[in-house]
C-alpha cells in the first residue's frame, strides 16, 4: 500500500500548485486576492480534497469575505482542476483557513517579548 500513499501525496502537491495558479490567474473575485494555498489533504480514495489557505489580513471581516469568495469559486476551481489533472474524476474540494501561520506568528511574538523582558 505505500504506492497508493505516494500517489495521494503526489496528487495533493499537484492540486496545491494548480489551485494556487487557478486562484491567481482565473478567479477574478477581489475577495480572493492575497490568498496563499498552504497545504492540501486528499482522502485515500481521491474523492475529497481539503485545501488550506492563509490571507494577508488579520481582520475577521476579511477572513469571512475571503471564505465566501472561495466558496463561490469552488465550482470554477474544481472544473479547472478536472481539466488540468490527469485523473478520472476531480475530487470534491473544500477550502479551510489554515490557523497554523497565525499560531506560529503569535508564538514568535511571545518569544520576542520574553527575550526583551529577560534583557531588562
UniProtKB/Swiss-Prot annotation:
Query: Which top-level group of life is the source organism from?
Result: Bacteria
| Example GO biological process | maturation of SSU-rRNA
Keyword Methyltransferase carried by entry: no
| InterPro entries on file | KH_dom-like_a/b, RbfA, RbfA_dom_sf, Ribosome-bd_factorA_CS
Localisation: Cytoplasm
Chief location: cytoplasm
Keyword Cytoplasm listed:
yes
Q: Name one GO cellular component term.
A: cytosol
- Please give the Gene Ontology molecular function terms for this protein: ribosomal small subunit binding
Per UniProt, the keywords (alphabetical) are: Cytoplasm, Ribosome biogenesis
Question: What is known about what this protein does?
Answer: One of several proteins that assist in the late maturation steps of the functional core of the 30S ribosomal subunit. Associates with free 30S ribosomal subunits (but not with 30S subunits that are part of 70S ribosomes or polysomes). Required for efficient processing of 16S rRNA. May interact with the 5'-terminal helix region of 16S rRNA.
UniProt record similarity statement: Belongs to the RbfA family.
Quaternary structure and partners: Monomer. Binds 30S ribosomal subunits, but not 50S ribosomal subunits or 70S ribosomes.
NCBIfam families in alphabetical order: rbfA
Name-wise, this protein is Ribosome-binding factor A
